[in-house]
Curated annotation (Swiss-Prot):
Belongs to the OMP decarboxylase family. Type 1 subfamily. NCBIfam families: PRK00230.1, pyrF. GO terms for molecular function: orotidine-5'-phosphate decarboxylase activity. Keywords: Decarboxylase, Lyase, Pyrimidine biosynthesis. Its EC number is 4.1.1.23. It catalyses: orotidine 5'-phosphate + H(+) = UMP + CO2. Pathway: Pyrimidine metabolism; UMP biosynthesis via de novo pathway; UMP from orotate: step 2/2. This is Orotidine 5'-phosphate decarboxylase. Pfam families: OMPdecase. One of its GO terms (biological process) is 'de novo' pyrimidine nucleobase biosynthetic process. Substrate binds at residues 16, 38, 65-74, 120, 181, 190, 210-211. It comes from Bradyrhizobium sp. (strain ORS 278).
Amino acid sequence: MPTEIAPCDRLIVALDVPSVADAEVMIATLGDAVTFYKIGMELTYAGGLGLAERLAADGKQVFMDLKLHDIPNTVERATRQIAKLGVRFLTVHGFSQSMKAALAGAAGSPLELLAVTVMTSYDDADLATAGYAMTVKELVAHRAVQARDIGIHGLILSPEETQLVRPLVGPDMQLVTPGIRPAGSDVGDQKRIMTPALAIAGGADRLVVGRPVTGAADPAAAAEAIVADIATAVALVGKTNRS
């Protein structure tokens, strides 16, 4: 029986900072307001693997956003190394060979894999320039179904696509959405965005938020406000998603 995700566990704060020292300051500033962190490529290359392991050991949930995509053997072996850190999520690009290899690397561990469908900084024009004949929504749907069939645990997708994808993949896949901006926030380099409450109402399970929290005058208060918005949205739609 699926159990409900606590509102605080639905918010994933992106530690998009250039050093472990900067990340540690932000983590201390956020304190108990945040339970789930995302570590991306910049921080990983600056020593973030050790930080991820420490956070996991301290009881925080960690999402390694590395978007693995290489020859299958490399993806499998890299995934196996990440699984040793004790983190919750790892991203892999939504190409069949990469997804299958990552699943092999995660076998026997609690690591959950999230397939990246289409980056939230892309739009239809960007896909056309890259040689894709599909629209964003068509490519997202195609990769979502492929990930479901391969056995991937969840998806990274824009909040604009959750209502399209949920009927295609069923209730058990985690839908994790970047491109989240509280009302009045700067959109930055994102093109497909939504407020936290609307994203939850649209079917997202977890929301990735960076600058609106880490760049706020009071990051802990900003995180708490987003969690409150999430809690309100969850109550309104009566979500009972998995933990």
